Amino acid sequence: MKYPIGIQSFESLRKENYVYVDKTEMVYELAERGKYYFLSRPRRFGKSLLVSTIEAYFSGRKDLFKGLAIDELEKDWECHPILHLDLNTERYNTVDSLTDKLEANLNDWEQLYGKNPVAKSFATRFEYVIRYAYEKTGHPVVILVDEYDKPMLQAIGNEELQNEYRGILKGFYGALKSQDRYIRFALLTGVTKFGKVSVFSDLNNLQDLSMDARYQALCGMTEGEVVRYFGEPIRALAIKNKLSEEETLARLKKRYDGYHFVENGIGIYNPFSLLNTFERLQFGSYWFETGTPSYLVELLKRDDYVLPHLTEEVSTADVLNSIDVVSNNPISVLYQSGYLTIKDYNAEFGEYRLGFPNEEVEEGFLRYLLPYYTGLHDVTTPFSMSQFIGDLRSGRPEQFMQRIASLFSDTDYKIVGNSELYFQNAFYLVAKMMGFYTKVERTTSNGRMDLTIETKDYVYIVEFKLDGSADVALQQINEKGYDKPFLMDERHLYKIGVNFSLEKRCIDAWRIEPAPSVGAYNKQ
């Protein structure tokens, strides 16, 4: 079985016998039901392949669709002129980078269909290209724009440049409305949907498919599709990892499923990660190998965002569906970029509860954030997560605390604002990362932060104080009886009181007490 990893051409996919999860029935429905569409989905979710599939369909390439659902549905297979603008191929850091891209595409189209020498602006030239393409071929035009939002995403944090991009693209896309009589179909795709003064404000007849239940599986794969199309690699993956097929499916679901684009919707798998897993027969973090956009961290830092709120956010459809570039709320960007997804829906109030879609995204995103909030880097051996976990599994609380203290003392404070927020965010990240390897319960409320960490042979109860005392923290563990759930547990128990100095921005004291108490010792 050949897996179309990175294959964005439908023609190449079909001619070279790559596996294809058939989405053509939905493509046919879109073509029959309407004319203008918009779709946002996370990166690496198959948007470009979808655009290529639609291009092949409207080019009348019946030969490429043999055996697929649309082969039985479509009778005419008309060939339409296609205007395909792919904005994903460039890096946009100046106005010229965008105008050069539009100029190149317009020149190509004008050579094919004709040019009006009087037309000067991009928008006017585009209008004439649409009209001339119709007049020359006798068929209405199909317009496909892939990653329409990439210029604006790369300009997040630069409001002036973003406004320039918006002004250019707003007029350019507005040509679709003025030339409606010459157009058969139009689809614009991207990662995000920008609101307020949108590039689509002149094109108000777009149907947004992003939260349309009928097309929630237009990109990505459902569990049924995974089982139907990939039985062979699932069996091979099970054998390679010494798992049953049921265990393999459960692990795939935990790792790569979990995207929900509508309320009470079905779970959608990330296709890129899934195909890489089948190709390599190894569970990995493939989505993050292709890079995490730095603008996400910039948004979180800009607002001094409280990271624990990532999995506690409640939002409305209006917020999820639209990004305001001057807003300090990063939630809509994180949702549309695929780092958060819908976990629950309150129909009475129209509210969505958000969270990480799956283990791959949660682990990868938190690992990506670690260097920005702590001194923990993968390349810094003393602070590697493996050594943290090694200390915990081997019953070395003193070494563990030394590493924790060193972690906070080695942080780049230039990016840190509020000291308490800094500690809360760093505390959250370290606890969550340890939670992928050990059982960790974290509590943060009323100025109190604590951890309960469980390994096979050891239990650690850790109480933190901010500008307090390690002795008081340890005393609170004993007085509140935080160790009571483990009194009958055969594992070794350690109680640890820790103080974090907000002024020094470091852990300045801790106290460790084995239980049952056989003597306590201090670190000052």
Residues covered by each model-derived region:
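Mg2+/Mn2+-dependent nuclease catalytic core
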Residues: 162-167, 466-483
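Conserved catalytic cores of phosphodiester-cleaving nucleases, focusing on short active-site segments
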Residues: 427, 451-466, 480
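Domain-level recognition of nuclease-like catalytic cores that cleave nucleotide substrates
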Residues: 485, 491-524
